[in-house]
Amino acid sequence: MTSLAAGKPAPLGASYDGKGVNFALFSAHAERVELCVFDEQGNEQRVDLPARSGDIWHGWLDAAGPGLRYGYRVHGPWDPAQGHRFNPAKLLLDPCAYRVEGDLPDDERLHGGMWEPDHRDSAAIAPKSQVVDLHYDWRGDKPPRTPWGETVIYEAHVKGLTLLHPQLPEAIRGTYKALGHPVMIAYFKSLGISALELLPVAQFASEPRLQRMGLSNYWGYNPLAWFALDPRYASDPARALDEFRDAVKALHAAGIEVILDIVLNHSAEIDLEGPTVSLRGIDNRSYYWVREDGDYHNWTGCGNTLNLSHPGVVEWARQCLRFWVDECHVDGFRFDLASVMGRTPEFRQDAPLFEAIRRDSVLSQVKLIAEPWDIGPGGYQVANFPPLFAEWNDHFRDISRRFWLQQNVSLGDFAQRFAASSDLFARDGKRPSATVNLVTAHDGFTLRDCVCFNQKHNEANGEENRDGTNNNYSNNHGIEGLDANLAVIERRRASVHALLTTLLLAQGTPMLLAGDEQGHSQHGNNNAYCQDNALTWLDWRQANPGLTAFTAALIHLRRRIPALTRNRWWQEGDGNVRWLNRNAQPLTAGEWQLGAACMQIQLSDRWLLTLNATAEVVDMVLPEGEWRAVPPFAGEDNPVIMAVWHGPAHGVCVFQRS
């Protein structure tokens, strides 16, 4: 390998065309870029990328093909005070690598240096990029395109969801293959969910601190390679991409969408003491938000923050999202710490990346979900994202928990959240589906732990229980921990049913955490990001079948209520909703201000929810007509017909008018 042809500047990354490979790399401040190719024995050959178009360096290697192992060495100024940290002693991953060989070890040879360059060569231990043939037979695949108003999201971890499932073939448990297996698809269908939202599947790394403690990053929110499927979830690591695509195809055939959690906010290079393995060495000042003193703005809490207002970085991010849609047929994205995407550095609805997505004919048509905050100044941006985005709604989570578990919010506050938080989202042309309602998620207590623990128990994370939020709005019902007497167990069961009913029958887009429908507990750990063990893996043998059936019945009931599926804002007198007191009369101004007590919510005229958040039995007079309790609150063969509901403490019921 003596030289390269000029090649072309687009697309970014290593593109195989059947005859050779085109390499294209963005770096605005580089002075020279070397392509480094490795043989099976690890011997390295270097050659300069010969052409530069604007800020894209590129070249074409004849007769190269899939499996080629490569990296970059990028030359440029070493001027940390100005944000420049070029160090050609460090082998760098292609930011668009479709496959990565090797992990990210805790080894000082990967460090580029803080204020002086580290000249130790890192090639022997650095992860390598690999060329991939992206061809795949998508014939017959048809994205479900489920309307937002009919969407029910199920948030899950590839490994944690499937590793302990006894009916799956042992060889595929914990893998992408398991997601598309008939056993899992049958479960998803019986539960009634419409979309599977996966925690990050792009290749990630464990932080050095965790490695030193013998732990690992389990959730995956520490990205190393945004375009590469993580091989640890593949039964055959060399086929990770195709195994994932096989699963997507199978899920689509069953009418289930696939939404990916993607981390476009920071990288695994962490802070200045972290490794130089990709973006830092390619163009630190362009890829990251750099302070005037040369250090990073840490608006993510992870050591660095991607600068998604730089045109070159915006195009890289856009191509990343297009890869997942075009080549993997995913149906949407959940963006972690998504306020970073809108920073300029202040948050703007017309930030460059938002505009790039809006103008993209493909990305503008998929489901986009924001976690609408980061930890930087002005980072909390709930309901402020562009209209294309739905958003996680922490108001719904907190008010729902406080209503049922702490009884310290008003009926008015609860009703506002139940009605798709219209005070927040009913503007800018947004629909009720813009609020993604949740009572739990991967971070925080599981639903069972919400009713079993008043305090977090994160000692296993190695931070002396300092990590994780202290604002859990939970209630152990008198006994801390899973073990309890029958009276406490019954109160906990009622609270779980009430929270699930609120989640799945409120207006907006519901998101269910995998395992909540089974009674899964993390034993009070509300930040299990580093627990790749039985604490986080769903134990299917211990699942609560009654709770699973209850959850499935609620999801199927949701689809029968027009007020919840039409995706239109409720208006006074439109027949969608009536808010009633225990005597079936409209709530008065004074009653709206009452602390969490009891109320009735009549939906689409024919459906009635009765809610008793008190610790006492409350009799409620139902509205005029003949009402029967419906599953999961009564059996179809023996429906309960009544005019008065004897509401148990912490109780809820749903009726249909005959």
From Swiss-Prot:
The molecular function terms of the Gene Ontology recorded here are: glycogen debranching enzyme activity; hydrolase activity, hydrolyzing O-glycosyl compounds
EC number assigned by the record: 3.2.1.196
In which family does this protein belong, per the annotation?
Belongs to the glycosyl hydrolase 13 family.
| Superkingdom assignment | Bacteria
Enumerate the InterPro entries for this protein.
GlgX_C, GlgX_Isoamylase_N_E_set, Glyco_hydro_13_cat_dom, Glyco_hydro_13_N, Glyco_hydro_b, Glycogen_debranch_bac, Glycogen_debranch_GlgX, Glycoside_hydrolase_SF
UniProt-recorded name of the protein = Glycogen debranching enzyme
Q: Which purpose does this protein serve, as stated in its record?
A: Removes maltotriose and maltotetraose chains that are attached by 1,6-alpha-linkage to the limit dextrin main chain, generating a debranched limit dextrin.
Native organism is Klebsiella pneumoniae (strain 342)
Catalytically driven reaction(s): Hydrolysis of (1->6)-alpha-D-glucosidic linkages to branches with degrees of polymerization of three or four glucose residues in limit dextrin
Q: Which Gene3D superfamilies match?
A: Glycosidases (3.20.20.80), Golgi alpha-mannosidase II (2.60.40.1180), Immunoglobulins (2.60.40.10)
Q: Where is this site: Transition state stabilizer?
A: D443
User: Which ranges of the sequence are coiled-coil?
Assistant: none
Q: In which pathway does it act?
A: Glycan degradation; glycogen degradation
Kindly identify the residues recorded as the active site.
D336, E371
Its keywords, alphabetically, are: Carbohydrate metabolism, Glycogen metabolism, Glycosidase, Hydrolase
Pfam families under this entry? Alpha-amylase, CBM_48, GlgX_C
Q: Which GO terms describe its biological process?
A: glycogen catabolic process
